[in-house]
Amino acid sequence: MTYRLEFDARALKEWQKLGDTVRLQFKKKLAQVIINPRVEANRLHSLPDCYKIKLRSSGYRLVYQVIEQEVTVFVVAVDKRERELDYRKAEDRLG
């Protein structure tokens, strides 16, 4: 089953600010995520039904929430991996 991909409005703005290379890397990972969104190794324990995608080379993270009743992968935050800012943004937006 393939999940639908949606963005929080603020996450979409963050996405649009990314460079082309970083965006392409995330697109490749998201293509895998919409097929199999629940990867246990990427689960965030502090946020319910949330998972992360890490781009180690560029230092970016993307946080998404799996919404089963809507069969949706919902992107909550995209940001640099600095002082856990990406996780704090996700927590505030889901809060």
Can you describe what each PLM-predicted range is?
Residues 1-2, 41:
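Solvent-exposed, charged interface segments at domain starts and junctions
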Residues 10, 25, 45-48:
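Short, conserved clusters of charged catalytic residues that mark active-site
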Residues 31-55:
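A short, surface-exposed loop/turn module that caps and links secondary-structure elements
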Residues 2-4, 12-13, 17, 24, ...:
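Enriched for short, Lys/Arg-rich terminal
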Residues 21-33:
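Compact soluble domain cores
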